[in-house]
Amino acid sequence: GGPAGKQNAVNQLLVLIYDPKSYKD
């Protein structure tokens, strides 16, 4: 998974908080 990169900063923060392992820039 992971954010598209150009999504909302809030969305990225949520990913970092709830699923940090899936957050890969």
Curated annotation (Swiss-Prot):
GO terms for molecular function: oxygen carrier activity. It is found in: Secreted, Extracellular space. Its main location: secreted. The keyword Secreted applies. Hemolymph. The keyword Chloroplast does not apply. Keywords: Copper, Oxygen transport, Secreted, Transport. One of its GO terms (cellular component) is extracellular region. Hemocyanins are copper-containing oxygen carriers occurring freely dissolved in the hemolymph of many mollusks and arthropods. Belongs to the tyrosinase family. Hemocyanin subfamily. This is Hemocyanin subunit 3. It comes from Maja squinado (Mediterranean spider crab).
